[in-house]
Amino acid sequence: MSGRVTPVRILGSLAASFVAWLVLRPLVGEGVAAILALGLGALALRYVPRAVLLRMLWTVPLFGLLLFVTVQLMFHVPGSPFASEKNTTEEVRKQQEELYGIPQKGFVGGCKFFGRYVHHLVADGTMGPCIKVQGRSVTDVLLPALPISFSLGLMALLLATGAGLTLGVRAGLRPNTLTDYGSMGFAILGVSLPSFVIGAMLMVVFALGKPWSWFPVAGWGSFGHIVLPAVALAMPYAAYIARLARSGTIEVMNQDFVRTARAKGLPEREVVMKHALRGAIVPVVSFLGPAAAGIVAGSFVVETLFGIPGIGRWFVNGAVNRDYYVVLGTVILECALVTAFNLIVDLAMPLLDPRLRGKA
């Protein structure tokens, strides 16, 4: 057991269960969501460290604050979901807004909409109707897009971690050499260019270019469709991970225990795998949480650029068309994915760094 049962542990596990139930209920149904949420809460109460549960306790108010700010931003931006419809009188537009529960613009209207939305989300387990797709709910349109965005984000994160660790460790083992300069040059280039610029360049070279038309321009359905957008999302974070891994490797290789291991005659490969790689992984793993959030934000533009029918594309379409329910639905799902990944990182850090186990 991770620790004795305290009010913080109980409240933290309840918060984890509530957030899981809130997100899963529109996707898998009330019964399955309740079972999964209760199981998650029981596991959290028994095994999750107190510090992580304390963060989970703050998840509920932060989750609500994020939704509130999103609603207020939408209600202070000019435009209406029905403003683009031609040959529609003002009276008909007002009736449509009343039908979809959309009050007047402004702070008060945003507060009313936020209250109704949270009430329906908690009481009914629905994310609302999709305004621009008649007869379909937000859950209906986002559920098929969720595995697409998840697989794209996971592939990008794996590429960023693998490439960044490889370049960073090699540079850290050979500082001030051609390998080091080449790796850091890649890092500077990757950090300087945003994902959508990298994506456009990759599309021109490897999809539209006649000599190297290896990958499809846009769409989804085969492994080739995921390569270019995943590389575009991964490259900026691979560059940053390479810098972290290089610094961690240099720091570890100058420690006394590494010199002792070498003095005992351990092979260089074993020294690198047991000590250098572990020293490089610790700062990288701590960065994976912010990297996941950045990849989620970058996927909004990259999915639109490559025509991928994921959650990010629905978010952009919802923002352009003022489809408030779709925007809030995508915010909820993306926030839940980032929160879950940050939880995994928090649980993995004490396993990699023994110094953190006493603080858990």
Q: What residue ranges belong to the model's regions?
A:
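Transmembrane-helix boundary motif in ABC transporter permease subunits
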Residues: 38-51, 71, 75, 131, ...
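Transmembrane alpha-helical segments of polytopic membrane transport and secretion proteins
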Residues: 1-58, 176-177, 347-360
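Membrane-water interface at transmembrane helix exits
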Residues: 21-25, 41, 45-49, 70, ...
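An internal, D/E-rich "acidic patch" concept
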Residues: 5, 103-165
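Generic hydrophobic transmembrane alpha-helix motif, especially the helices
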Residues: 15-36, 40-43, 62, 155, ...
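Hydrophobic alpha-helical transmembrane segments of membrane transport/permease proteins
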Residues: 62-115, 209-225
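Transmembrane helix irregularities
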Residues: 77, 190-193, 296
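Alpha-helical transmembrane segments of integral membrane proteins
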Residues: 50, 142, 146-179, 195, ...
